[in-house]
A protein has these predicted regions:
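Walker A (P-loop) phosphate-binding loop of P-loop NTPases
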Residues: 14
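NTP-dependent small-molecule kinase module
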Residues: 1, 122, 143-147, 160, ...
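ATP-dependent NMP and nucleoside kinases share a basic, alpha-helical "lid"
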Residues: 94-147
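Conserved lysine of the Walker
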Residues: 17
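Short beta-strand-centered segment that lines the nucleotide-binding/catalytic pocket of NTP-utilizing
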Residues: 30-44
Length: 209
């Protein structure tokens, strides 16, 4: 029985995961793209005042159980998805249901940080890690994350919340070596790296039939 292929695009903040994943989706017929940030907890949980910023981000940011039970586990077990799935709406800090249909033999791409944590890793058929140094990532987020505030406020947020949690992930999981493929996703090599990933996915799919 052919089962769905579940591809993870892992990487730290500002590494280019979303851009790469969108291009990859466009090149893969019928693949559906899910963003891990569509499955975050509301602010009251992910900004829990009883723990540090980095602890809240690392352990209280995402609804792993919901993602697993509603999407990853059924597909991994050879079942189709045909129903309403809750997606986070940042405008009202709540969830809205959307109809999702994925055939049992379909393909999905999940992009987000920390995808190789023990909660998720075994559900992926392959994980691509986008490895970009901190200086380049910081330059990107300073020019992108204006919703946080000024550049000083963005830097403060990353230094108190995101970077410490990312360092913990790197130490606990060594995602560069755990991943099936490691890419740089720089613009000059982006097309070539997308082609490389597509070939890798196709070869892996052929070998598991």
């Amino acid at each position: 029985m052919n089962k769905a292929k579940i591809i993870g695009i892992d990487g730290l903040g500002g590494s280019g995961k979303t851009t790469f994943s969108k291009i990859l989706q466009q090149r893969l017929d019928h693949a559906k793209l899910f963003h891990l940030d569509d499955f975050i907890y509301p602010k009251s949980i992910r900004y829990d005042q009883n723990v540090s910023e980095q602890e809240a981000y690392y352990n209280k940011q995402w609804r792993y159980d919901y993602l697993i039970q509603s999407i990853l586990k059924p597909l991994k077990n050879g079942l189709p998805i045909n129903g309403l799935i809750e997606f986070y709406n940042k405008e009202n800090d709540d969830y809205e249901e959307k109809q999702v249909m994925i055939p049992a033999e379909g393909m999905i791409i999940v992009e987000g940080v920390f995808l190789q944590r023990k909660e998720l890793r075994d559900y992926f058929d392959a994980v691509i890690f986008i490895d970009v140094n901190k200086e380049d990532r910081l330059e990107r987020v300073l020019g992108r994350d204006h919703y946080i505030g000024t550049q000083d406020e963005i830097l403060k947020k990353y230094e108190s919340r995101y970077f410490p949690a990312e360092d913990r992930y790197l130490e606990e999981y060594d995602p560069v070596h755990l991943a099936d493929r490691v890419l740089s996703a720089v613009n000059s090599r982006l097309e070539r790296e997308v082609n490389d990933v597509i070939s890798f996915i196709e070869n892996r799919s052929s070998s598991t039939r």
